[in-house]
């Protein structure tokens, strides 16, 4: 059994938010009620969509097999070797779940959902800075930090190991401009404090790393797991240039997302888990094989190396992940939704991108998978 190590939030080291980087955020407010992951789980249950898995399931292959064989949201409540911990998968496994995540009534026609979300994109909602939040319930310093304390799954037989990041946020800033990015870049767990981060060459994170390496410095990155679903949706999106991912998340859920400063980065105050760390300059490691959205395994021989320096988590955190590889799974549902909003870019060739978006918009999942295999280069996340 893995036990959660913790310190109380009163022991959180570091300056007040007003002192970070020598300036105060323009506005700081008290924490308000936020549509966090736990509220979303309750919505799924109230709507009769959630299946609570009460039998013991193995993190090694079992979580993934259950998720691929059942087309509904799953909350695993008994995980082998991790007493008391939980995992949510398939949270956005169909349009009804997406409706619930973004505050729509279940019966609203899908065309109206897309039209309303398209309208929402015209009104970015800037994030709200707060001084505290559930993410500060427990703070674990580097000296005792162990990412293996969480029930990180090995999702499929094709996977070479356990994947920490499959439905999460990687938050970073351009060291030259300070521009913020939140994206979903898959992460393979390498040990107690290390993981890979796979990012395509055209991604914002890759540019941030490139600029940091040009300066010869490490790039700070925060990994948020179990953030509100609107944030995960936005992190997977190709944001319009006039807004960042947190603006987009606020627009989609019609409510400002709440962020708290951790070092030089802002992280979701209501995430279940936040891992602070660094990408080391000039270091590349192999990531994979890993069963990707295309239904085939791939490998990235030039993934970044992430080293965790501090861990924050809610009490009794819920791990959030995604079992990729099956046509119509929640990653496909997300891609289809984003394509219908003209917000999908998987960094493929122009022809491949055009073809994929055509089929994603029509929810032709198997055909979109096939097109994805044609252009597969093992770097398929934003």
Where are these regions (language model features)?
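Extended, highly charged
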Residues: 4-8, 21-305, 309-382
């Amino acid at each position: 059994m893995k036990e959660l190590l913790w310190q109380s939030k009163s022991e959180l080291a570091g300056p007040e938010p007003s002192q970070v980087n020598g300036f105060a955020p323009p506005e700081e407010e008290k924490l308000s009620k936020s549509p966090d992951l736990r509220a979303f789980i309750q919505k799924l249950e109230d709507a009769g969509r959630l299946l609570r898995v009460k039998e013991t399931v193995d993190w090694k292959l079992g979580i993934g097999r259950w998720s691929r064989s059942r087309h509904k949201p799953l909350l695993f409540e008994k995980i082998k070797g991790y007493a008391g911990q939980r995992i949510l998968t398939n949270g956005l496994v169909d349009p009804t779940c997406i409706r619930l995540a973004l505050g729509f009534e279940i019966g609203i026609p899908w065309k109206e959902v897309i039209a309303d979300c398209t309208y929402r994109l015209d009104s970015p909602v800037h994030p709200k800075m707060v001084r505290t939040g559930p993410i500060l319930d427990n703070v674990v310093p580097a000296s005792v930090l162990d990412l293996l304390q969480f029930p990180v799954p090995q999702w499929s037989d094709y996977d070479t190991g356990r994947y920490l990041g499959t439905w999460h946020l990687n938050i970073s800033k351009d060291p030259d401009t300070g521009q913020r990015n939140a994206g979903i870049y898959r992460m393979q767990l390498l040990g107690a404090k290390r993981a890979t981060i796979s990012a395509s060459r055209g991604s914002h994170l890759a540019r941030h790393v490139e600029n940091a390496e040009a300066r010869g410095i490490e790039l700070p990155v925060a990994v948020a797991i179990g953030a509100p679903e609107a944030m995960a949706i936005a992190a997977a999106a190709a944001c319009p240039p006039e807004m960042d991912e947190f603006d987009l998340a606020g627009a989609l859920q019609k409510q400002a997302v709440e962020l708290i400063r951790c070092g030089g980065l802002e992280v979701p105050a209501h995430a279940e888990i936040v891992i602070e760390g660094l990408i080391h300059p000039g270091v590349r490691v192999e990531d994979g094989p890993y069963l990707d959205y295309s239904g085939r395994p791939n490998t990235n021989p030039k993934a970044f190396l992430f080293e965790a320096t501090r861990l924050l988590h809610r009490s009794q955190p819920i791990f959030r992940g995604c079992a990729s590889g099956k046509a119509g799974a929640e990653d496909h549902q997300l891609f289809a939704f984003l394509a219908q909003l003209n917000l999908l870019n998987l960094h493929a060739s122009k022809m491949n991108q055009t073809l994929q978006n055509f089929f994603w918009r029509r929810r032709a999942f198997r055909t979109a998978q096939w097109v994805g295999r044609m252009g597969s280069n093992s770097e398929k996340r934003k």
